[in-house]
């Protein structure tokens, strides 16, 4: 193994998806996995296969599709979890099972109610059983940040002896300071020697996740567990884009250490994850925030114009931010120019059907918008890719909401080869839209979350709506996306998109149920 190579383990599809409101359906997870592969991620933690039939389906389908990245499923130190993980990743070109058990005194006493010897016995069993499915097993000492080093060494000896190749040390509650975590990693890395790769997984409860990750790398960790945009439970995880660019930019500190991440794909990956989850990075977010390469101060602007490095320590192009587009699109632009633009923006694997549908929407948009920005095009392509599976397709929407009148929505939806029209009143315009769609489709949705943002600037900016809708008590809420200059039209599209996601998932699970054991 190259001791200077930092393995990048992305857990956006597992830990990142556990962020409130960030759930993804299988098709969305596949889109993200394909982009992560393009980004050059070494290991993709595709989910927790035993958590639900939907999770199993997502992990197994990603395992079938991805060829260059190792596909991993999380599993508790429980036989059935490990079995489901093994079955889910069995078709992967490169596969891994990531199993874990808590090792901190507080977790062992209050959560597990187990002694240290019992924890070690369970850990050995988990690794040995996982090895019957895959050769590559990772073991995590949950809450390592609050665990005792002598006991962690005992656990490490046991699981390495059982066949674990990677030992992960999670700061599960984001408690450690960089100096403390660095010292812990240094001691345990030296203890492991060449027997196993030391990994870290840092949470951001004190805002130190990336700092802790970098401290670990400087002290011997050779795998970092990260997420796109820093998504994750509570305050999130170490952000892939931050850790990777810090290692690349600060060669004076990290020396010969490197990752094989294709950094010009960082921005496209960030935008895809933000679009799918509906969770936008804060404007001043490092690397991928809207203001990351913006300079408003006159002094700063003057400096950058004279010499870029006066106020920019990395080039926007290094992470895929295109600041000066050379190809301007308008209503007279043809299909060839549109294709060139989307390739320039990094969408080189768009299907012909997705391209054609996006181009038709582009022409409609160009008739209503003076200037088409790169972000407009990016959103059109992403939206089309996410909404291609259309059981129901919105054809038309007309709303009436007079100041003293009753909000009414008239909706036309295409189902198979039939156009169905109906209208309903509601407590507000949105309520009227949702009630009409429910009447047409026969499904009653419960709105769990609703977000709307302006994609670009100006009065004619595109509105991006993200909804989370529940259609039955046994399934999670499904995410839908809508894009339009008209916010209510985008809302209707997003609601129908959530329904289509629900129906698509339901159809796939009924076909794959025989694979669940």
Swiss-Prot record:
Quaternary structure note: Homodimer.
Pathways per UniProt: Amino-acid biosynthesis; L-leucine biosynthesis; L-leucine from 3-methyl-2-oxobutanoate: step 1/4
Domain Pyruvate carboxyltransferase: start-end pairs: 6-267
Binding of Mn(2+), residues: 15, 201, 203, 237
Organism whose genome encodes this protein: Aliarcobacter butzleri (strain RM4018)
Subcellular compartments: Cytoplasm
Keywords noted in UniProt: Amino-acid biosynthesis, Branched-chain amino acid biosynthesis, Cytoplasm, Leucine biosynthesis, Manganese, Metal-binding, Transferase
Entry's family note: Belongs to the alpha-IPM synthase/homocitrate synthase family. LeuA type 1 subfamily.
Keyword Plastid among UniProt keywords: no
CDD domains: DRE_TIM_IPMS (cd07940)
GO biological process: L-leucine biosynthetic process
Lineage: superkingdom: Bacteria
EC number: 2.3.3.13
Cofactor: Mn(2+)
Catalytic activity: 3-methyl-2-oxobutanoate + acetyl-CoA + H2O = (2S)-2-isopropylmalate + CoA + H(+)
GO cellular component entries: cytoplasm
An example Gene Ontology molecular-function term: acetyl-CoA C-acetyltransferase activity
NCBIfam families (alphabetical): leuA_bact, PRK00915.1-3
Function field: Catalyzes the condensation of the acetyl group of acetyl-CoA with 3-methyl-2-oxobutanoate (2-ketoisovalerate) to form 3-carboxy-3-hydroxy-4-methylpentanoate (2-isopropylmalate).
Keyword Nucleotidyltransferase: no
Annotated spans, Regulatory domain: 393-517
Designated name of the protein: 2-isopropylmalate synthase
SUPFAM superfamilies registered for this protein in UniProt: 2-isopropylmalate synthase LeuA, allosteric (dimerisation) domain, Aldolase
